C-alpha cells in the first residue's frame, strides 16, 4: 500500500515521524482525511486528535492547534503542543482538567474565561487520546 511521510513538529522539536497510509485531522474548516498523493493544502488546525493509520492500525496524537501542510508525498503538522497517546501523562492531564474546571466554576472578574475554556479543551483532548 502507498504511504505518505508524516511529521508532527512543535517548538520543542519533533513528536512523530513515520510513513503512514492515511492521516485524519480536525481543521478549522472541518475534518480532513489525507491519503498519499493528496493535493497541496495548508489549513489551520483545531485542538483535537490526529489519527494516523499505519500497517492497518490507528495511532493517535493530541495536538493543541497549529497548522497542517500537505504535499503529495509529505504531511507536516506544525503544532503549538503535541503528544503521542503513549507519551501523555494522564495524571498531569487530569490535574490540568480539574484546574480548568475550577477556574470556570469559580468565575471572578479577573478570570480569563476563554483561556480557561481552551485549557479545558486541551486537557480533555489529551485524556481522550490517552484513552481515559
From Swiss-Prot:
Main location: membrane
Membrane disposition: Peripheral membrane protein
Gene3D superfamilies, per database record: ATP synthase delta/epsilon subunit, C-terminal domain, F0F1 ATP synthase delta/epsilon subunit, N-terminal
Pfam families, sorted: ATP-synt_DE (PF00401), ATP-synt_DE_N (PF02823)
Keywords (A to Z) from UniProt: ATP synthesis, Cell membrane, CF(1), Hydrogen ion transport, Ion transport, Membrane, Transport
Record localization: Cell membrane
Cellular-component GO terms for this entry: plasma membrane; proton-transporting ATP synthase complex
A GO molecular function held by the record: ATP binding
InterPro entries given in the database record: ATP_F1_dsu/esu_C_sf, ATP_synth_F1_dsu/esu, ATP_synth_F1_dsu/esu_N, ATP_synth_F1_esu_C, ATPsynth_dsu/esu_N
Keyword Membrane: yes
Family: Belongs to the ATPase epsilon chain family.
PANTHER family: ATP SYNTHASE DELTA/EPSILON CHAIN, ATP SYNTHASE EPSILON CHAIN, CHLOROPLASTIC
Role, per record: Produces ATP from ADP in the presence of a proton gradient across the membrane.
Subunit and interaction comment: F-type ATPases have 2 components, CF(1) - the catalytic core - and CF(0) - the membrane proton channel. CF(1) has five subunits: alpha(3), beta(3), gamma(1), delta(1), epsilon(1). CF(0) has three main subunits: a, b and c.
Protein name, per record: ATP synthase epsilon chain
Species assigned in the record: Bacillus velezensis (strain DSM 23117 / BGSC 10A6 / LMG 26770 / FZB42)
High-level lineage: Bacteria, Bacillati, Bacillota, Bacilli, Bacillales
Gene name for this UniProt entry: atpC
Amino acid at each position: 500500500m502507498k504511504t505518505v511521510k508524516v511529521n508532527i513538529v512543535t517548538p520543542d522539536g519533533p513528536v512523530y515521524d513515520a510513513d503512514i497510509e492515511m492521516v485524519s485531522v480536525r481543521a478549522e474548516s472541518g475534518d480532513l482525511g489525507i491519503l498519499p498523493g493528496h493535493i497541496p493544502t495548508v489549513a489551520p488546525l483545531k485542538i483535537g486528535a490526529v489519527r494516523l493509520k499505519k500497517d492497518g492500525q490507528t495511532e493517535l496524537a493530541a495536538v493543541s492547534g497549529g497548522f497542517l501542510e500537505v504535499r503529495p508525498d509529505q504531511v507536516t503538522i506544525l503544532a503549538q503542543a503535541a503528544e503521542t497517546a503513549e507519551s501523555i501523562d494522564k495524571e498531569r492531564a487530569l490535574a490540568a482538567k480539574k484546574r480548568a474546571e475550577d477556574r470556570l466554576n469559580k468565575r471572578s472578574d479577573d478570570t480569563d474565561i476563554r483561556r480557561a475554556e481552551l485549557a479545558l479543551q486541551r486537557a480533555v483532548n489529551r485524556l481522550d487520546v490517552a484513552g481515559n
